[in-house]
Design a protein with these regions (language model features):
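Flexible loop linkers connecting adjacent transmembrane helices
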Residues: 5-11, 44-49, 72-97, 122, ...
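Juxtamembrane transmembrane-helix boundary signature
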Residues: 32, 59-91, 100-111
């Protein structure tokens, strides 16, 4: 009987996709989650909470909803075509379209790496008094070695561990503060734009919905040896990928919300402005104790390292895709993309006087590039030439294009407000 059961499980080498086995498909989404609980998010979220209290929590909710839709759509592309977003753009669009967009995506990945490396460096300064410049070099060196010497599976396990540490750290911090939960609940679903908050809103949006994550998700979703032999198998994969995305983005929503809640309950409630993350740690000590401040710094270090890993992977994927290649740690173009992203980010860090403001501006750059990536993605996933029968429906295309338009309008409003 036992042998008969084993034969059934081996038949067609096909995995069972029901029940507890669905947890095997959790993973790619969590790599994306790291990208929007990175140090740039910390800077944006603590600025939002310290300056405007609970009022900008709705931005986290809106951004996360947009993120779920966009990330599932781009993972859809990866599963159906076997191509990442960069490869698909190179294959299916003219060079005059793909090259400028992918070029700006590389710049966005550099901006991302800048924020991630800075976050790790700031955490090292908090914990061990290592200067930011040396901390940046250490973070970049460690991440480069990690990317060049580890398999995807090992990296995925490490990232899941890092996300767990970050989540537990903020859960502990929230137990120490007095949260106005009724006000928080209203703020999660009630849009409010306080005077002077537009830059912070755009920074939060750019910190949650990030262009490099769209490229990354379409790449890492292919890392599993999925069975795609027929339409039923592909549709099951799309369903379970959606569960992975929904769960992972939900984790990210909770952690981002926790940052704003913590800042609102401590800094905003005591009329304390926060100009930099180092200041946030020092201000937490008298309010919540030394242990809470140390846990804050440790979580920031985990966020910095893990998000630098994923931004490096995304840069490698984008750059390799420009040459029609998929990401692989031994591929020359993938390695060049990683080194370009981390190396240029390090050079820029040398000239930054205010690291905290640098984190805010880096998120704004991501938000400005984002519409180009979204329009590219939706154009590809709406094309029957690219996706066949799995192309977006008219309703899905309408929703996705509407998101791109909303982001574009917000960007124009931001640029206008900053210019006048």
């Amino acid at each position: 009987m036992w042998n008969f059961i084993k034969e059934l499980r081996r038949k067609d080498h096909q995995r069972y996709l029901g029940g507890l086995d669905s947890f095997k498909y959790i993973g790619p989404g969590l790599l994306v989650t790291v990208g929007f609980i990175d140090p740039g998010n910390w800077a944006s979220n603590f600025a939002a909470g310290a300056d405007f209290g609970y009022s900008l929590l709705w931005v986290i909710t809106l951004s996360t909803i947009m993120l779920i839709v966009l990330q599932h759509n781009v993972a859809h592309l990866g599963i159906v075509t076997g191509l990442c977003l960069s490869e698909a753009a190179t294959k299916y669009t003219p060079k005059w379209v793909s090259r400028p967009i992918l070029g700006t995506a590389v710049l966005a990945s550099i901006s991302t790496s800048l924020a991630e490396i800075l976050g790790g460096a700031i955490a090292l300064e908090m914990l061990f008094d290592i200067p930011v410049i040396w901390g940046s070099l250490l973070t970049a060196f460690f991440v480069t070695i990690m990317l060049f010497t580890n398999s995807y599976k090992r990296i995925e396990r490490s990232i899941i561990a890092f996300v767990s540490v970050i989540g537990l750290s903020f859960l502990y911090e929230l137990f120490l503060v007095d949260i106005d939960w009724p006000l928080a609940a209203r703020s999660w679903v009630t849009p409010s734009i306080p005077e002077g908050s537009l830059l912070v809103i755009m920074s939060v949006l750019g910190a949650v919905v990030m262009p490099h994550n769209l490229f990354l998700h379409s790449e890492v979703v292919q890392s599993r040896e999925y069975n795609k032999k027929d339409d039923a198998s592909i549709r099951k994969l799309l369903k379970y990928e959606f569960y992975d995305t929904l769960f992972s983005m939900g984790v990210g929503w909770a952690i981002n919300s926790a940052m704003i809640l913590l800042a609102a309950a401590t800094f905003f409630a005591n009329h304390i402005g926060v100009e930099e993350l180092q200041q946030a740690k020092s201000l937490l000590e008298p309010l919540l104790g030394n242990q809470a401040a140390t846990i804050f710094a440790l979580a920031l270090l985990m966020a910095g390292i893990s998000s630098t890993v994923t931004s490096g992977m995304a840069a490698g994927s984008i750059f390799a895709g420009m040459f029609g290649e998929s990401y692989h740690v031994k591929d020359v173009h993938s390695r060049v993309g990683i080194l370009l992203s981390l190396g240029i980010a390090l050079v820029v860090i040398l000239f930054i006087e205010n690291p905290f403001q640098g984190l805010i501006i880096s998120q704004m750059i991501l938000s400005i590039q984002l519409p180009f990536t979204i329009f590219l993605q939706v154009g590809l996933t709406s094309s029957k030439r690219v996706m066949g029968q799995y192309a977006n429906s008219r309703w899905s295309s309408f929703v996705l294009y509407t998101m791109a338009v909303i982001v574009s309008v917000l960007n124009l409003a931001l640029l206008f407000s900053e210019s006048f």
